[in-house]
């Protein structure tokens, strides 16, 4: 599993002050641009992409409806994604499929989509349908993060992930059970068939995240012969 760490600057000054060397243990950097005012995102972008030049990077605009910090109309959402994609060619672009399904057709030319679904309230009963619909669209990655309230919620998502990965071995998945009870899902990625696990450096970007240092140690232990 690859370890992903998010950067969440709230201003150009914070972006410029980021110390990229602190993120060397991360395999991929996620830029959570939703922590900025929408009019500042394109102004801050050069600093982020220069700071992490040569690193794999995910561009993410996590909207409030899916647990993020920004509200965007479909037109604003698509415009910002397309501008960043065309100017900086991030390795991955997160797209909130269920929040912006009506404009998804405008993203069909982008081969590096992470089609995502986030539910900070529950693990919905229709998880299989969600995973199936996202898988059929054949994105670079399918990402699902849902809140776990019981151990069964966690086991269900792990089992669904393993099943879908077995049936679709070429498709990459990232599935996460959020919250304290869901922490175990963050360290079992290799078993369930999830490609990434999100870790934290200073500030968590989702409930239940484990520190990068701890995740690195856990991965080393799991990789031992």
UniProtKB/Swiss-Prot annotation:
Which positions are catalytic residues?
A: 118, 143
Keyword field contains Amino-acid biosynthesis: yes
Pfam family for this entry, one: DHquinase_I
EC numbers for this chain: 4.2.1.10
Please give the InterPro entries that the UniProt record associates with this protein: Aldolase_TIM (IPR013785), DHquinase_I (IPR001381), Type-I_3-dehydroquinase (IPR050146)
Is Lyase there in the keyword field?
yes
One GO-annotated biological process of the protein: chorismate biosynthetic process
Pathway, according to UniProt? Metabolic intermediate biosynthesis; chorismate biosynthesis; chorismate from D-erythrose 4-phosphate and phosphoenolpyruvate: step 3/7
Catalytic activity line of the entry: 3-dehydroquinate = 3-dehydroshikimate + H2O
What is the main EC category here? lyase
- Family recorded in the similarity comment: Belongs to the type-I 3-dehydroquinase family.
Q: What PANTHER family is this protein classified in?
A: 3-DEHYDROQUINATE DEHYDRATASE (PTHR43699:SF1)
Q: What is this protein called?
A: 3-dehydroquinate dehydratase
| High-level lineage | Bacteria, Bacillati, Bacillota, Bacilli, Lactobacillales
